[in-house]
Amino acid sequence: MSVSLVSRNVARKLLLVQLLVVIASGLLFSLKDPFWGVSAISGGLAVFLPNVLFMIFAWRHQAHTPAKGRVAWTFAFGEAFKVLAMLVLLVVALAVLKAVFLPLIVTWVLVLVVQILAPAVINNKG
């Protein structure tokens, strides 16, 4: 199996785990109040959707043989776009949807923690 295929499978698993965390957190917060659940889901999607866009961007550029030094610039551009998209989604959730801050920020942090810890668990072959 090629390295790119392995990294694609790991990325898909990571995105799936993040989506499951968003859904689970939204369901748990909706037990208190349905709007808390919506707020939690919007906080999780503020991390999940930019990650999906970044993965699509990375997969699209993975097929090409880039020029020397271009990989770093492409990665930096994609990461900057991801952070900017996350900030825009958080502002929309707080300003437009009037989301409750606590479930939004808790789910946001949860998905970020999953983003950091899940690759170590996924790659652990035991």
UniProtKB/Swiss-Prot annotation:
It is a multi-pass membrane protein. Residues 36-37, 95-100 are periplasmic. Pfam families: ATP-synt_I. Residues 2-14, 59-70, 118-126 are cytoplasmic. InterPro entries: ATP_synth_I. The chain crosses the membrane at residues 15-35, 38-58, 71-94, 101-117. One of its GO terms (biological process) is proton transmembrane transport. It is found in: Cell inner membrane. One of its GO terms (cellular component) is proton-transporting ATP synthase complex. Coiled coil: none annotated. Keywords: Cell inner membrane, Cell membrane, CF(0), Hydrogen ion transport, Ion transport, Membrane, Transmembrane, Transmembrane helix, Transport. Belongs to the bacterial AtpI family. A possible function for this protein is to guide the assembly of the membrane sector of the ATPase enzyme complex. This is ATP synthase protein I. It comes from Escherichia coli (strain K12). The gene is atpI.
